[in-house]
């Protein structure tokens, strides 16, 4: 049999006309009986067949017939006189159907010729290879399972509008193999993290999404109202304080993979709703956390991609090498060597320099900022975006780390790190502050900052203080941004590419 050159259906100028024509076809189907049947069960998937019979030639398949039942979406159709082909796509991949009136009957064949691209179809038949060597299903029975009323995008142009890809992700997934690959990699990444945590004796838990007091991070919360309790509540900005309550309760290793919500801007790195993995381990510190996090991320890459060496936006990123470790001032002087030690400890200089770089130092967060907070702001302006290779920035100042344990040896510094790759923060962790009186004092300072106009400053959580007063063992805790990690592993330039349904403005 010969396979003619593929011809594409003409692109209709009026999509509404296409939809109207398809609705007419659906009405005809309804008149014939059940328009959306649900009694077909596939026995095989496309990728499974392509893999299992990759080495089976035409003669082998003829000598040992393989009966299959396959269903999926019709992506291409080539109708000829007495023999036609259709490319059908299921959740695993694609396979070709070969359809003739002799095999399926003249009535079914005539109906098939009227079916549209995008329709969900099913076939029972036997495998064979065409003269060109393509593995195909010779259909003995052919059925229409679901009529597609809307046409798929043109094959050659696809979903050219990027926002439309986000808004109609269901269509994007149908027509863009790379999108499907991205979300499969995301699932593999999360599965790998879960296995890694369970193998390290961590227990997965679930903590509340609705909080009476927002806490665990410096962020602006979403506010809602609980009608039955008649009280204001907040979508959680972080699970940290609840997870540490569990450490107090005796669960010495816990983790949670779930959503956080922050009522802030949208950018290539930020979405108001995002996925975090936070974990806490008793009798550890931030040094242990850095080693553990490094191993976890390396293993996630291997499990998702098969390698620890990845390509991101045209540059290589080697996760197999030991991650770098720098203090805030070391990072500044590495990537902006014009700054001297004296300048980095000069309050007036730092404020002037930040203003020159475009930072509004008059905002509430800077009014009473100390040297450490000013150094951090300068780091964010001069060094952060240049941290391509995996790098831990360590020793954050107390004033910007209200939940972290202070250093025993260096005044004003905490045992805290943030992990950066490709210029983005991926993780944040520290030895946890378990002194209830110190924690209460820091909460009070946060309240003062909030009263001064800093919307992201923390509230005073009296119940959390009460939990600490029961005694929390020395603990290390870390949060990893799952979305940003998946961005790296899938070479995605924006967080929207790794969220199935990112937040968008309303359609007009």
UniProtKB/Swiss-Prot annotation:
Transmembrane segments: none annotated. One of its GO terms (biological process) is lysyl-tRNA aminoacylation. It is found in: Cytoplasm. It is an enzyme of class 6 (ligase). Its EC number is 6.1.1.6. It catalyses: tRNA(Lys) + L-lysine + ATP = L-lysyl-tRNA(Lys) + AMP + diphosphate. GO terms for cellular component: cytosol. Its cofactor is Mg(2+). It comes from the Bacteria. One of its GO terms (molecular function) is tRNA binding. InterPro entries: Aa-tRNA-synt_II, aa-tRNA-synth_II, aa-tRNA-synth_II/BPL/LPL, Lys-tRNA-ligase_II, Lys-tRNA-ligase_II_N, Lys-tRNA-synth_II_C, NA-bd_OB-fold, NA-bd_OB_tRNA. Keywords: Aminoacyl-tRNA synthetase, ATP-binding, Cytoplasm, Ligase, Magnesium, Metal-binding, Nucleotide-binding, Protein biosynthesis. Homodimer. Belongs to the class-II aminoacyl-tRNA synthetase family. It comes from Burkholderia vietnamiensis (strain G4 / LMG 22486). PANTHER family: LYSINE--TRNA LIGASE, CHLOROPLASTIC_MITOCHONDRIAL, LYSYL-TRNA SYNTHETASE. Pfam families: tRNA-synt_2 (PF00152), tRNA_anti-codon (PF01336). NCBIfam families: lysS_bact (TIGR00499), PRK00484.1 (NF001756). This is Lysine--tRNA ligase.
């Amino acid at each position: 049999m010969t396979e003619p050159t593929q011809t594409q259906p003409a692109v209709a100028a009026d999509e509404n006309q296409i939809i109207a024509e398809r609705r007419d076809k659906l009405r005809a189907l309804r008149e014939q009986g059940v328009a959306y049947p649900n009694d077909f069960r596939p026995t095989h998937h496309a990728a499974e067949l392509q893999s299992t019979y990759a080495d089976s030639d035409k003669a082998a398949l003829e000598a040992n017939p393989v009966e299959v039942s396959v269903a999926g979406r019709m992506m291409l159709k080539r109708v000829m006189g007495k023999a036609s082909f259709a490319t059908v796509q299921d959740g695993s991949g694609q396979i070709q159907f070969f359809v003739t009136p002799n095999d399926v009957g003249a009535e079914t064949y005539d109906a098939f010729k009227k079916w549209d691209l995008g329709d969900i179809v099913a076939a029972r038949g036997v495998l064979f290879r065409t003269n060109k060597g393509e593995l195909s299903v010779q259909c003995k029975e052919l059925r229409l399972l679901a009529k597609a009323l809307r046409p798929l995008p043109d094959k050659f142009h696809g979903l050219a509008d990027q926002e439309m890809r986000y808004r109609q992700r269901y269509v994007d997934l149908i027509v863009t193999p790379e999108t499907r690959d991205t979300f499969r990699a995301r699932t593999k990444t999360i599965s790998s993290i879960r296995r890694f945590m369970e193998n390290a004796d961590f227990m997965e838990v679930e903590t509340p999404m609705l909080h009476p007091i927002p806490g665990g991070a410096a962020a602006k919360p979403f506010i809602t109202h609980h009608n039955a309790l008649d009280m204001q509540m907040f979508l959680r900005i972080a699970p940290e304080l609840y997870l540490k309550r569990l450490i107090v309760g005796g669960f010495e290793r816990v983790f949670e993979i779930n959503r956080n919500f922050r009522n802030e801007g949208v950018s290539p790195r930020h979405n108001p709703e995002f996925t975090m993995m936070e974990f806490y381990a008793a009798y550890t510190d931030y040094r242990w956390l850095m080693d553990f996090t490094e191993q976890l991320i390396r293993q996630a890459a291997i499990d998702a991609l098969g390698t620890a060496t990845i390509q991101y936006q045209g540059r290589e990123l080697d996760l197999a090498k030991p991650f770098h470790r720098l203090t805030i001032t070391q990072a500044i002087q590495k990537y902006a060597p014009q700054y001297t030690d004296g300048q980095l400890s000069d309050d007036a200089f730092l404020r002037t320099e930040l203003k020159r770089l475009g930072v509004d130092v008059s905002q509430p967060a800077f009014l009473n900022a100390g040297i450490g907070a000013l150094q951090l702001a300068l780091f964010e302006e001069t060094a952060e975006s240049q941290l391509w290779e995996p790098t831990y920035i360590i020793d954050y100042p107390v004033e910007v780390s209200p939940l972290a344990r202070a250093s025993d040896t260096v005044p004003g510094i905490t045992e805290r790190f943030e992990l950066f790759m490709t210029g983005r923060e991926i993780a944040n962790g520290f030895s946890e502050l378990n002194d209830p009186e110190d924690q209460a004092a820091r909460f009070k300072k946060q309240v003062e900052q909030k009263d001064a106009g800093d919307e992201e400053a923390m509230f005073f959580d009296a119940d959390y203080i009460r939990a600490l007063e029961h005694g929390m063992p020395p603990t290390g805790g870390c949060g990893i941004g799952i979305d940003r990690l998946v961005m790296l592993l899938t070479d995605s330039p924006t967080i929207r590419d790794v969220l199935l349904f990112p937040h968008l403005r309303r359609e007009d």
